[in-house]
Regions:
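Bacterial N-terminal signal peptides that target proteins for export
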Residues: 1-9
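Hydrophilic extracytoplasmic domains
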Residues: 28-29, 218, 228-273
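Tryptophan-anchored aromatic micro-motifs
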Residues: 36-54, 152-177, 212-213
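N-terminal glycine/threonine-rich, aromatic-flanked beta-hairpin/loop signature
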Residues: 55-102, 176-228
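Residue-level recognition of beta-strand termini and adjacent short loop/turns
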Residues: 66, 121-123, 188, 241-243
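An anionic, turn-rich surface loop/hairpin at beta-sheet edges
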Residues: 102-119, 220-239
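Edge beta-strand at a domain terminus
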Residues: 133-165, 209-214, 251-273
């Protein structure tokens, strides 16, 4: 798990810069496809690292829009043991040479990150790659990892469909409840409101928070909020679907022993008076 934390942290470093370069590396040469840049167009999410599933908290979304431009969305907080990052479609420059991609980031005058992807297979729904990452600080290697990674393509984008007021109808997995006492109202500006029932059974906005923000990229939902005099908190979910007035989220979570479990949360849209 720590290995992926390092990968996610390094990926976040990319988002602090817009330097994307390509190199030729003859390690494990393959010919996964012609016109790689064209096949990459769209949104992609990492789902397996070295054959192990990636938990939702550590996922991100890469969006390739051309042969020279890409975006990345990722949320990492201090509780994950890494640098705090909140990037909603951070623009990146992209260069591709054959089946090789190398991401190079000079995040500051001391730190350089080089991330290499040697793509071994790609089709319309997934791609796999041999992956190397090296982070140096003042010329000294601080991190080096190698492994295999699999991305799957996201076919839907729920940024517009999530706008509105939603009431939670139940949570399963890890903990289960159905008290009908949670509402979230998502706005187009990337903020949201949280509602609870008061003692009289009336819906009341929670006003003890300094801020509440979210973003959706494809089906990846990230939220963050901060209560007065408390640390910032975050959540990560994957939107399964939004169909008319029904919405479902899922998330793969990790236990302290490294095992995983899935959570499912169902929502119903509320039409405001």
């Amino acid at each position: 798990m720590k290995k992926f934390l390092s990968w996610a942290f390094a990926a976040a470093l990319i988002c602090s810069s817009t330097v994307f370069t390509s190199c030729v590396n003859e390690d494990n040469p393959v010919n996964p496809a012609d016109n790689l840049a064209e096949k990459l167009i769209g949104k992609w999410m990492p789902v397996y690292l070295d054959g192990n599933p990636v938990v939702t908290d550590l996922k991100s979304v890469y969006t390739f829009v051309s042969a020279t431009k890409a975006y990345m969305s990722v949320s990492i907080n201090a509780q994950q043991g890494e640098e705090i990052v909140w990037n909603n479609q951070k623009e990146l420059d992209l260069s591709i040479n054959g089946n090789k991609m190398t991401l190079t980031n000079h995040s500051d005058e001391h730190t350089t990150m080089v991330e290499e992807f040697n793509i071994t297979a790609i089709d319309g729904s997934a791609f796999t790659a041999n992956h190397k990452i090296t982070v140096t600080v003042d010329g000294s290697v601080m991190l080096h990892n190698e492994g295999t990674i699999r991305f799957e393509k996201l076919t839907r984008d729920y940024r517009e469909a999530i706008i509105g007021l939603w009431e939670c109808k139940g949570l399963k997995g890890g903990e289960t409840y159905n008290d009908g006492n949670d509402r979230l109202e998502f706005f187009e500006d990337g903020t949201y409101k949280y509602w609870r029932k008061n003692d009289a059974g009336e819906w009341e906005e929670v006003t003890t928070r300094e801020f509440q923000e979210y973003f959706v990229d494809g089906g990846f939902l990230c939220t963050r909020w901060k209560n007065v005099d408390e640390d910032e908190l975050r959540e990560w979910w994957e939107i399964v679907n939004i169909k008319r007035d029904k919405m479902q989220w899922k998330a793969l979570r990790a236990n302290e022993d490294g095992s995983t479990f899935e959570q499912i949360m169902d929502w119903e849209k509320i039409e405001e008076d």
